[in-house]
């Protein structure tokens, strides 16, 4: 029977974090892909917090994850609102076009 240790979760979190960093560096043009990569990065960090919290028998890591998820939800809502305004005005979702939204 396979038991999952802390190192398994940390390795998986590191892999997810690395995938999100690669996604950010390889695709700097598309705003939607950047938002998804940032969300994946936050979820990798959250998974590490929960893993440490579980193995150390401390609930503070899991409570901290709820705060991070709240901030991530607000960040996603604001990012998607900016994305919708950008697409309605310019018919494009490229990061380079964000400078043209100035008042």
Curated annotation (Swiss-Prot):
Query: What enzyme category does the UniProt record give?
Result: translocase
**Major localisation:** membrane
**What UniProt keywords apply to this chain's record, in alphabetical order?**
Cell inner membrane, Cell membrane, Membrane, NAD, Quinone, Translocase, Transmembrane, Transmembrane helix, Transport, Ubiquinone
Report a single Gene Ontology molecular function: NADH:ubiquinone reductase (non-electrogenic) activity
Its UniProt entry gives the catalysed reaction(s) as: a quinone + NADH + 5 H(+)(in) = a quinol + NAD(+) + 4 H(+)(out)
Role noted for this protein: NDH-1 shuttles electrons from NADH, via FMN and iron-sulfur (Fe-S) centers, to quinones in the respiratory chain. The immediate electron acceptor for the enzyme in this species is believed to be ubiquinone. Couples the redox reaction to proton translocation (for every two electrons transferred, four hydrogen ions are translocated across the cytoplasmic membrane), and thus conserves the redox energy in a proton gradient.
Q: What is this protein called?
A: NADH-quinone oxidoreductase subunit K
Instruction: Please name the source species.
Output: Dechloromonas aromatica (strain RCB)
Query: What gene makes this protein?
Result: nuoK
């Amino acid at each position: 029977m396979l038991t999952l240790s802390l190192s398994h979760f940390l390795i998986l979190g590191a892999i997810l974090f690395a995938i999100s960093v690669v996604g950010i560096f390889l695709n700097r043009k598309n705003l939607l892909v950047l938002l998804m990569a940032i969300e994946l990065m936050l979820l990798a960090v959250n998974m590490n917090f929960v893993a440490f919290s579980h193995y150390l028998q401390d609930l503070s890591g899991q409570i901290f994850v709820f705060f991070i998820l709240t901030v991530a939800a607000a960040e996603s809502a604001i990012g998607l609102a900016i994305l919708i305004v950008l697409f309605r005005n310019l018919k494009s979702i490229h990061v380079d076009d964000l400078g043209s939204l100035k008042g």
